Amino acid sequence: MSVPAFIDISEEDQAAELRAYLKSKGAEISEENSEGGLHVDLAQIIEACDVCLKEDDKDVESVMNSVVSLLLILEPDKQEALIESLCEKLVKFREGERPSLRLQLLSNLFHGMDKNTPVRYTVYCSLIKVAASCGAIQYIPTELDQVRKWISDWNLTTEKKHTLLRLLYEALVDCKKSDAASKVMVELLGSYTEDNASQARVDAHRCIVRALKDPNAFLFDHLLTLKPVKFLEGELIHDLLTIFVSAKLASYVKFYQNNKDFIDSLGLLHEQNMAKMRLLTFMGMAVENKEISFDTMQQELQIGADDVEAFVIDAVRTKMVYCKIDQTQRKVVVSHSTHRTFGKQQWQQLYDTLNAWKQNLNKVKNSLLSLSDT
């Protein structure tokens, strides 16, 4: 993608025009080009460009596109420091004013650069910061497949990869994109190895709390396979996660009674935890039993007789369980329930089901062939 220039003249004259323009707006900058060359001129222009950011959007974009077009002429080794300086200016400008303009300017820079240029990492991180500051994360590309490709294209170090994913996660959380944020955090934690998993303690802890707090998250067994989460084994946070993965409501109640201060310190609300654990317990019951009596539900879920119907309705709304109420016989009839964990047993059940379908389809095929022969 080409970036529009400020004016169709030589690079030296273009730099001089930019200097003159900035000086006319009150910048402390000489109108004469530096003897050090274009990269020195650009360093001084970028340092003084704050004054133009208060002008009309079209004027600012024209000036900044001119700066960008000159930046892209430079050798890659001379670009990096200047691009970092420009990005810092746009991220920090007036404590968040004119976010849409700054997003546009950063986007022009990002898409104007060669797709494999490593310094695009700096520009993309700046885009994330500005978008997060104004709740506009939906206006920049954040698809995980694309981010993975960029990480590969830019040949990022492990540290930069973790920084980018952590920054993206926090931005998505701030912008209320909980599903996307969870996927990014899992990607981040999954990128650690046994050698450096201990460095991700904070991220792993945050991931668990965020998942438990999410009102739309009910399946957590995949978190236990992540190396940074495994590193937390033996700690209360890991014990709590294990309860939400496979234990019943009674186990959570006992844990809460023994660790109330810990639950409160995580920012988790006990009543919300109880509601989620009731659903998770019911899901487990529904997998094992196609019919569940009201009395059993009252005992296992610790609810009153008058609350059973409302609970079932709420459970069905989550689409984790499909069932109907039989008021006459005081029971719930289950048609389907999502497994809380998916291990070897579930894979075997899936294999058996698919194999049965295959055999039935072969029978249908053979029947149709025999009919066609006649």
From Swiss-Prot:
UniProt keyword annotation of Glycoprotein present: no
N-acetylserine: residues bearing it: S2
Organism domain of life: Eukaryota
InterPro entries per UniProt: ARM-type_fold, COPS7/eIF3m, eIF3m, eIF3m_C_helix, PCI_dom, WH_DNA-bd_sf
Tissue: Broadly expressed.
Role of this protein: Component of the eukaryotic translation initiation factor 3 (eIF-3) complex, which is required for several steps in the initiation of protein synthesis. The eIF-3 complex associates with the 40S ribosome and facilitates the recruitment of eIF-1, eIF-1A, eIF-2:GTP:methionyl-tRNAi and eIF-5 to form the 43S pre-initiation complex (43S PIC). The eIF-3 complex stimulates mRNA recruitment to the 43S PIC and scanning of the mRNA for AUG recognition.
Oligomeric and partner information: Component of the eukaryotic translation initiation factor 3 (eIF-3) complex, which is composed of 13 subunits: EIF3A, EIF3B, EIF3C, EIF3D, EIF3E, EIF3F, EIF3G, EIF3H, EIF3I, EIF3J, EIF3K, EIF3L and EIF3M. The eIF-3 complex appears to include 3 stable modules: module A is composed of EIF3A, EIF3B, EIF3G and EIF3I; module B is composed of EIF3F, EIF3H, and EIF3M; and module C is composed of EIF3C, EIF3D, EIF3E, EIF3K and EIF3L. EIF3C of module C binds EIF3B of module A and EIF3H of module B, thereby linking the three modules. EIF3J is a labile subunit that binds to the eIF-3 complex via EIF3B.
Lineage: Eukaryota, Metazoa, Chordata, Craniata, Vertebrata
UniProt-reported outcome of changing L361P: Reduces HSV binding and entry
Keywords, comma-separated and alphabetical: Acetylation, Cytoplasm, Host-virus interaction, Initiation factor, Phosphoprotein, Protein biosynthesis
Chief location of this protein within or outside the cell: cytoplasm
Domain PCI: 180-339
Name under which the protein is recorded: Eukaryotic translation initiation factor 3 subunit M
Encoding gene (name): EIF3M
Record-stated family: Belongs to the eIF-3 subunit M family.
Gene Ontology molecular function, alphabetical: translation initiation factor activity; translation initiation factor binding
Induction behaviour: By glucose deprivation in neuroblastoma cells.
Subcellular localization, as worded in the UniProt entry: Cytoplasm
Positions of post-translational Phosphoserine modification: S2, S152, S367
Interaction with HSV-1 and HSV-2 as annotated region, ranges: 344-374
Modified residues (N6-acetyllysine): K254
Organism: Homo sapiens (Human)
Cellular component, GO annotation: cytosol; eukaryotic 43S preinitiation complex; eukaryotic 48S preinitiation complex; eukaryotic translation initiation factor 3 complex; eukaryotic translation initiation factor 3 complex, eIF3m
GO biological process, one term: cytoplasmic translational initiation
